[in-house]
Amino acid sequence: MPPLVFDIDHIKLLRKWGICGVLSGTLPTAAQQNVFLSVPLRLMLEDVLWLHLNNLADVKLIRQEGDEIMEGITLERGAKLSKIVNDRLNKSFEYQRKFKKDEHIAKLKKIGRINDKTTAEELQRLDKSSNNDQLIESSLFIDIANTSMILRDIRSDSDSLSRDDISDLLFKQYRQAGKMQTYFLYKALRDQGYVLSPGGRFGGKFIAYPGDPLRFHSHLTIQDAIDYHNEPIDLISMISGARLGTTVKKLWVIGGVAEETKETHFFSIEWAGFG
């Protein structure tokens, strides 16, 4: 399961730290909603490592499959949650009805249809003649919470793990993929003030922005780290990057970590025909 963030306030805080992620919440049965994605926010593994190593996040590891967790909690608390939701809906609808009726009375007073001497029976007749009750019922809405009531009950396995254990588990995925140095590329770019996002659609590991992606264009497509002293550049990958990068005016950036000095170095390839 990829790293996920479900809380809106946490997502706002992450953006201040230069981590934007990708919104992935959608309605599977309503394809038109895919344009307006919502929580959870899916992070890259590098984002989680950076947050964890800088003491900016409390990482919770869930070993069970999500479907099994949800099924167990739903069976255990389904009836209770249903009652809570219905009670909250009824209270919300009651408040909305009162607010709409008070608003309607204020408008009638403003245009002179009623005054302080108008009786409740007269007001009721006015409501019936104008179908006001039907209009109020049709305007009621359901307020959807930003956080899940069920996710709070998920029991994580990280309570018994030390900070070093969590770091080892996070780095283990990198060691298995043989791309341990890629995180050091990520860290070096973050240290230089870049904001990084997944770069798969442009043929890279990351795309790098000089600031907030809503304000700046990305000119860099970052590739996986390589041992540039001994490992050749994959020409097929470079050609693919050229085809994708030329259209959107992006440099093709490769880099790696020098074994002797442990310094991170970057090299860029700019395509002819920009503009």
From Swiss-Prot:
InterPro entries: tRNA_endonuc-like_dom_sf, tRNA_intron_Endo_cat-like_sf, tRNA_intron_Endonuc_cat-like, tRNA_splic, tRNA_splic_SEN34. One of its GO terms (biological process) is tRNA-type intron splice site recognition and cleavage. GO terms for molecular function: lyase activity; nucleic acid binding; tRNA-intron endonuclease activity. Its EC number is 4.6.1.16. SUPFAM superfamilies: tRNA-intron endonuclease catalytic domain-like (SSF53032). It catalyses: pretRNA = a 3'-half-tRNA molecule with a 5'-OH end + a 5'-half-tRNA molecule with a 2',3'-cyclic phosphate end + an intron with a 2',3'-cyclic phosphate and a 5'-hydroxyl terminus. It is a peripheral membrane protein. Its main location: nucleus. It is found in: Nucleus; Endomembrane system; Mitochondrion outer membrane. The active site is at residues 209, 217, 250. One of its GO terms (cellular component) is tRNA-intron endonuclease complex. Keywords: Lyase, Membrane, Mitochondrion, Mitochondrion outer membrane, Nucleus, tRNA processing. Heterotetramer composed of SEN2, SEN15, SEN34 and SEN54. Interacts directly with SEN15. Constitutes one of the two catalytic subunit of the tRNA-splicing endonuclease complex, a complex responsible for identification and cleavage of the splice sites in pre-tRNA. It cleaves pre-tRNA at the 5'- and 3'-splice sites to release the intron. The products are an intron and two tRNA half-molecules bearing 2',3'-cyclic phosphate and 5'-OH termini. There are no conserved sequences at the splice sites, but the intron is invariably located at the same site in the gene, placing the splice sites an invariant distance from the constant structural features of the tRNA body. This is tRNA-splicing endonuclease subunit SEN34. It comes from Saccharomyces cerevisiae (strain ATCC 204508 / S288c). The lineage of its organism: Eukaryota, Fungi, Dikarya, Ascomycota, Saccharomycotina. The gene is SEN34.
